[in-house]
Amino acid sequence: MVTPFPEVSEWLCIGQIVGAHGLRGEVKVKPFSDFPERFTVPGCRWLRSPRQPQPYAVTLLRGRFLPRAEQFVVTFAEISDRTAAEALKGAEILVPASDRPPLAANEYHLMDLIGLAVYHQGERVGEVVGLVNAGNDLLEVQLLDPAPKAPQSVYIPFVPAIVPVVDLAARRIEIDPPLGLLP
C-alpha cells in the first residue's frame, strides 16, 4: 500500500539532519520534538531539503540517543553509505501534522507558539519567532520597539511563573518577566 502524500501545509518538522555518522549511512539528527520515539521506533518518515523541497518518504530502521551531544543517530533503509548521508545534511525530518501526540492540560506543541503575540502588563511587546531547548525551553521573542543599541530579540524561559497565560485561540501569550529580562 502506498503511503498517502499529505498536503505540504500539514507537515510537522521533528528534527534536522546535522551530519553523517560513521561509514554505513547513519545520520546525526538535532531533535525538535520532545517525543524520542519519533527517532527510535521504525516506520515511515519524510525528508525535505533545500535541494529537494518536495518531501519524500524514507523508512527509519532504528535510532539511538547520544546524551552528550543531545542528538539522535538514526538509520534509514534508503541511505547505505557515508556519501549519501553527507548529502542529507540540512534536511528536515517530517511527519504529518495529524501524527501529533495528544497533550495533557497546559501542555503545548512548541511549534504552535511561533507567531504568537507577546504581551506584558497589557501592552504588546513582541512576537515569538523561535524556540531554543536549553534545559528549559526558551521562547525567542522579537521585540516590537527595541531601544537603540538594545537587542532586537530576547529569550524568555517558557515556565508558568514567567509565561502564566498561553491563549492559542487568541494567538497570544502574556509574560510576567523578572526585572531585567526585558531591556
From Swiss-Prot:
GO molecular function (one): ribosome binding
UniProt xrefs under Gene3D superfamilies: PRC-barrel domain (2.30.30.240), RimM (2.40.30.60)
Annotated keywords: Chaperone, Cytoplasm, Ribosome biogenesis, rRNA processing
Sequence ranges assigned to domain PRC barrel in this UniProt record: 105-181
Pfam families listed in its UniProt record: PRC_RimM, RimM
CC per GO annotation: cytoplasm; ribosome
InterPro entries the record matches: PRC_barrel-like_sf, PRC_RimM, RimM, RimM_N, RimM_N_sf, Transl_B-barrel_sf
Family matches, as SUPFAM superfamilies: PRC-barrel domain, Translation proteins
Subcellular location: Cytoplasm
Any one of the GO BP annotations: rRNA processing
PANTHER family registered for this protein in UniProt: RIBOSOME MATURATION FACTOR RIMM
Family in the record: Belongs to the RimM family.
HAMAP family: Ribosome_mat_RimM
Record function comment: An accessory protein needed during the final step in the assembly of 30S ribosomal subunit, possibly for assembly of the head region. Essential for efficient processing of 16S rRNA. May be needed both before and after RbfA during the maturation of 16S rRNA. It has affinity for free ribosomal 30S subunits but not for 70S ribosomes.
Self-association state and partner proteins as the record states: Binds ribosomal protein uS19.
Domain-level remarks: The PRC barrel domain binds ribosomal protein uS19.
Name of the protein described by the UniProt record: Ribosome maturation factor RimM
Organism name: Thermosynechococcus vestitus (strain NIES-2133 / IAM M-273 / BP-1)
